[in-house]
């Protein structure tokens, strides 16, 4: 049986490893897939109103392409968030450290060990980096996806049949952002 201090240290290590892993929490997954579904469904309006593709006749096509696009966009969110989180954490470290130190009262400051202060700073830094990386990842990928859909639909594929135009523009847009998200820089 492991000593009590050992299990506490193990849980702290697990929390730290969780902060730096590629695995998403259920909350992050729901946020990513919800946003990805919304942004993937937006082009349906474009094709329904501008390209005159009937909603009922094209419902199966819209559903399949929206689901495929949702998966690829959520994949891109996850990859971009992972790359950005470490960069944001490094840039925000000093500011977060000052903020946490300032928030601790003098009494708390004297009672707390240096290790505990460092743990609080690390936890806050990871929380800030996670939030900023998540919001920027969603913004960046949504913008890129919608711009590529519009450019592909109205300029590159404008002479194609609307059904082929839809399939190619949604596939190209979601595939491109998924591909670009796999880069490490």
From Swiss-Prot:
PANTHER family: TRANSLOCON-ASSOCIATED PROTEIN SUBUNIT GAMMA (PTHR13399:SF3), TRANSLOCON-ASSOCIATED PROTEIN TRAP , GAMMA SUBUNIT (PTHR13399). The modification N-acetylmethionine is found at residue 1. Belongs to the TRAP-gamma family. The keyword Cell inner membrane does not apply. It comes from the Eukaryota. The gene is SSR3. It is a multi-pass membrane protein. The modification Phosphoserine is found at residues 7, 11, 105. This is Translocon-associated protein subunit gamma. The lineage of its organism: Eukaryota, Metazoa, Chordata, Craniata, Vertebrata.
